Amino acid sequence: MGALSHIRVLDLTRVLAGPWCAQTLADFGADVIKIERPGAGDDTRHWGPPYLKDAHGADTAEAAYYLAANRNKRSVTVDIATPEGQQIVRELAAQSDVVLENYKVGQLKKYGLDYASLRAVKPDLVYCSVTGFGQTGPYAHRAGYDFIVQGIGGFMSITGERDGVPGGGPQKAGVAIADLATGLYSTIAVLAALAHRDRTGEGQHIDMALLDVQVALLANMNTNFLASGTPPVRWGNAHPNIVPYQTFQTSDGWIIVAVGNDGQFRKFVEAGGRPELADDERFATNPARVRHRDTLVPILAEMVKTRSKTAWIDALEAAGVPCGPINDLAEVFANEQVVARGMEVALPHPCGADVKLVRNPVRMSATPPDARTAPPLLGAHTDDVLRDMLGYDDARIAALKAKQAI
């Protein structure tokens, strides 16, 4: 039984940040009911290709993007623009511990589904709103997108190659880091609010903003700036204070070499057949290497190109030089450590084939998270939830379908 098996979550979110929070809670055992638009559902259901393939190898209508953030949930289709749909959500909220939503600021108020309205039917409700810029401030009513937030929040100013070198300029992260981190911070906030509720009986409203999270994620870069007044700059895959501490291209791929001291530098160049570099006064110490970075790094780059990725990893690991490969995802899921940790899971799907997903990375001895059910088909649980939770009979459900309220 999961640690959160006593918790029910009403998930009114779409795309990534909110669904990521809901999926995390579901992994730990929470009963998550995902509210979706009839006939369309979560936008990400259609964000393909690639799509999940059925037992015959043909594409289904389930986009891989949607599959990433929606396992362990029940899907209920409700049109919240209709009075009947609004009533359904209110009745479900009255039987839930948590409501998650990521609508624009104020949008749910016109439907009577904002925090104040739902608190009236469930006084101890934990209600988490996820938006781009939060419920207050001059940007509150702007739409928030991860890419834009990475720029506004400073992440891209410190990510990417240095200006003035080939490929220089700001870069976004390869995944939606602001969305994902907001999902995780939202999970933490929900759990803290539930702990407070359990002690006091008091619910509360949680106001999560992608921009707030993105700014917070810069961590020591923030404090470096706040202490010095000097904005940090991009260093690409290099380190501003340590050389060599960066990526290098081998004859068949890329590796990371993270030399942390002068002894490791000597071992690195000895492994590469260039021991004289360690005795060169320009490179003998780290401060000297930092000063002569632009001279040293091209020499090392030519040295590294002479061997394969595997040959370098074997040689440097044997010499005690910190290093690692830069793997593509095919290599990641074939990696012996990733395999040993069971990071890939397969769950049966109604399409007749298994859906391959990535397991929750948390390991717990008593209440581990679990991937129990595949991401649901659109509306797969509508009838069951209305019947079992709300007591609707078949005639009432049929009438709601005729009105396109569900």
Role assignments for model-derived ranges:
Residues 163-164, 183-204, 216-227, 269-276:
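Oxidoreductase and adenylate-handling cofactor-binding alpha/beta cores
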Residues 135, 165-177, 198-214, 233-240, ...:
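Conserved Rossmann-fold dehydrogenase catalytic segment
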Residues 243-319, 323:
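Aromatic-enriched alpha-helical interface/lid elements that frame and gate functional surfaces
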